C-alpha cells in the first residue's frame, strides 16, 4: 500500500491526540527562561492576541482549535507540528523554519511567512488568502483544497511543489519559477507575474486554463 504525505500526516495526528494537554503561556515562559524546546505538547482552545511567541522551538506538537491573532512567531522553529482548525490570521512567522508540518482546516488570511524555510509541509482545506510567502524556500510542499487567492509568493524557490483542488485567484508568483507545477485541477485566474511571463514556463495547465492564460498573454483564441 502506498501512503501519501497527507495520509501519513493523519496517522501522525491520531498519535498526537494522546499528547498531554499543555498551557501555551506556561510552557512559553519556561522555554524562554531555560532556552529549551517545547516538545510533545498538545494545545487546545488557546486564544492569544498580539502575543510575542518569537524565537520558540516546537517539536512534535499539536495545535487544535486555537486562535492566534496578530501574534509574533518570527524566527521560530516547527518540526513535526500539526495545526487543526486554527486561526493564525495576520500573524507573522517570518524567518521561521517549518519541517514536516500540517495545516488542516486552518485560517491563515494575511499571515506572513516571509523568508521561511518550508520543507515537507501540507496545507489542506485551509484559507491562505492574502498570505505572504515572499522569498520562501518551499520543498516538497503540498497545497490541497485550499484558497491561495491574492496570496504573495514572490521570489520563492519551489522544489517538488504539488497542488490540487485549490484556488489561485489573483495570486502573485512574481519572480517565482513554476516549471513542473501542475495546476490542472485548480481554479486559476488573474495570476500576477512579470511582463515576460517567464514564471509560467513549463508549468502544467488544463485546456480551459490555457484559454484564461491566453488572455493574460494578450492572445485571442477563436
Identify the meaning behind each predicted range.
Residues 14-222:
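Tandem repeat scaffolds
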Residues 1-12:
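N-terminal amphipathic/basic-hydrophobic helices that include classical n-h-c signal peptides
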